[in-house]
Design a protein with these regions (language model features):
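N-terminal, leucine/charged-rich tether regions that mediate assembly and partner docking
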Residues: 24-140, 162-163
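Short, surface-exposed acidic
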Residues: 64-67, 136-139, 167-171, 219, ...
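Long, charge-dense
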Residues: 145-149, 157-210
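Soluble non-cytosolic domains of exported or imported proteins
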Residues: 46-50, 115-123, 146-154, 166-169, ...
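Extracytoplasmic/secreted envelope proteins and their assembly/folding machinery
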Residues: 52, 56, 122-129, 153-160, ...
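C-terminal interaction module
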Residues: 18, 29-30, 202-252
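Sec/Tat-exported extracytoplasmic proteins
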Residues: 59, 63, 129-133, 159-167, ...
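Sec-dependent N-terminal signal peptides of Gram-positive bacterial secreted proteins and lipoproteins
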Residues: 1-24
Length: 252
C-alpha cells in the first residue's frame, strides 16, 4: 500500500528542520557550494564508448577544463542508491551533470535529449532535487536512446553522497514516492482535457512550500491540514476538476 505522499512529506520536513542544526556541515547545498568547483558527471554504465562520447557532448563536457574524474552509475550502485534488489542485467543509459550556481540563482534543470527521457520530466527532476535539499544548482540530463531517465536521477543522489552530502534515507524515499505518484497520475490523465502535467509539478512545489510554512506556524499537521493545503493549491492551478479523488488521496 502506497504511503500518504504529503503526510510523509510533512514528517520529513520536521525531521530535516531538526537535523539541519545538527548536521549543518554536511548540508546538501553546502556540499554543492564547496565541492562542485567543477561540474560533476555521472554516466550510465551501459553506454558504449560512442554513446558515452555522444552523451558527454550533450551534457557540455569539456575535456580541457572538466578534469574531475567521471563517475559511473553501475547496477550495484543503483541498487544501493535506490534501495532495490541488485540486478546485474539492468541497463543504465541516462546520465547527469551537476554544477553549482551562485546563491541567488534558482535551481535549474534541463533535459538535453527530451525525446529520449520517456518517464522523468524536468519538473520531476526538479521536485526530487528540492526534496533532497538542493537549492542552487544546475542539473543537466541526457541519454542516447529512449529510456525512463531513472538512472540519471540515481546519479544525482550518488554524486551528492559521494561528495559528502548526508542525504537522509527518508528524503530519498520521499523523492521516489513523489516520482512514482507523479508518473502514475500523468499516465492516468494522459490526453485528458484540462490536465497539464507541468501545472501539477508546479502545484506540488507550492504544496511543499505551504506545508513547510504551516508546520513552522502550527507544529504537527493533521491529515485534514494537509488535505486543505493540497486541495486549495490544486484549485489555484485549476486542476481540482481534473485530478480525481483517488489521485488526491495518493498525493495526500
Amino acid at each position: 500500500m502506497r504511503k500518504k505522499l504529503f503526510l510523509t512529506s510533512a514528517a520529513v520536513l520536521w525531521a530535516v528542520t531538526a537535523m539541519n542544526s545538527v548536521h549543518a556541515a554536511t548540508d546538501v547545498q553546502k556540499v554543492i557550494d564547496e565541492t562542485y568547483v567543477q561540474p560533476e558527471y555521472v554516466l550510465g554504465s551501459s553506454l558504449s564508448e560512442d554513446q558515452k562520447n555522444q552523451t558527454l557532448k550533450k551534457l557540455g563536457y569539456n575535456a580541457s577544463t572538466d578534469t574531475k574524474e567521471l563517475k559511473t552509475m553501475t547496477p550495484d550502485v543503483y541498487s544501493k542508491i535506490m534501495n532495490v534488489a541488485n540486478d546485474s542485467s539492468l541497463q543504465l543509459y541516462s546520465s547527469a551533470k551537476i554544477q553549482k550556481l551562485g546563491d541567488k540563482s534558482p535551481l535549474e534543470v534541463k533535459i538535453e535529449t527530451p525525446e529520449n527521457i520517456t518517464k522523468v520530466t524536468q519538473d520531476m527532476y526538479r521536485n526530487a532535487a528540492v526534496t533532497l535539499g538542493v537549492e542552487h544548482a544546475k542539473i543537466t540530463v541526457a541519454a542516447p536512446i529512449p529510456v525512463t531517465g531513472e538512472s540519471a536521477l540515481a546519479g544525482i543522489y550518488y554524486s551528492l553522497e559521494a561528495n559528502g552530502a548526508k542525504v537522509p534515507q527518508a528524503n530519498k524515499d520521499l523523492a521516489q514516492e513523489e516520482l512514482k505518484a507523479l508518473s502514475d497520475i500523468n499516465a492516468e490523465n494522459k490526453d485528458k482535457t484540462g490536465y497539464d502535467a507541468n501545472k501539477l509539478n508546479v502545484a506540488l512545489a507550492d504544496i511543499k512550500s505551504g506545508l513547510a510554512k504551516a508546520k513552522e506556524s502550527k507544529g504537527n499537521l493533521t491529515e485534514e491540514d494537509v488535505r486543505k493545503i493540497v486541495e486549495d493549491t490544486l484549485k489555484n492551478y485549476k486542476l481540482d476538476q481534473v485530478i480525481t479523488g483517488n489521485q488526491i488521496n495518493i498525493i495526500i
